Amino acid sequence: MRAHRINAYEAAPAAMKTLVAVETYLHQTTLGARLIELVKMRASQINGCAYCLDSHSKELRKGGESEQRIYLLDAWHESPLYSPRERAAFAWTDALTRISETHAPDDVYDELRRHFDDKEIVDLTTLVGMINLWNRLAISLRYEHPVP
């Protein structure tokens, strides 16, 4: 695999500024920083984005998340460590990240409605869309995570 291809911030600063503005908005919502980072980590696991996995695992640790919850996120459906609200968010994240296969199933949406209001569902859906966009930018432009 080739090294880094394009620096998106240099090539399209206005586009990147807009994406960062959406991220700023998302961090002002009622979703909460921890859930936001867990959702970003989960989508990044599905997409196989090493750059984003590195970044979001560090953010989770900085925010006080336990190593066990970070490690087991890939098997969230088998672990009792996550709340019903988190599990509903992860199921929605999985469904939207794999949307060509799932088409956002009604049962997943119905469970989501039990834990999130309309605005939160739109915010969560925006969050999932954004991390999928970031994953695609990082993977396609070959962003590399730091190596200690």
Feature-to-residue mapping (PLM):
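Hydrophobic alpha-helical segments
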Residues: 1-148
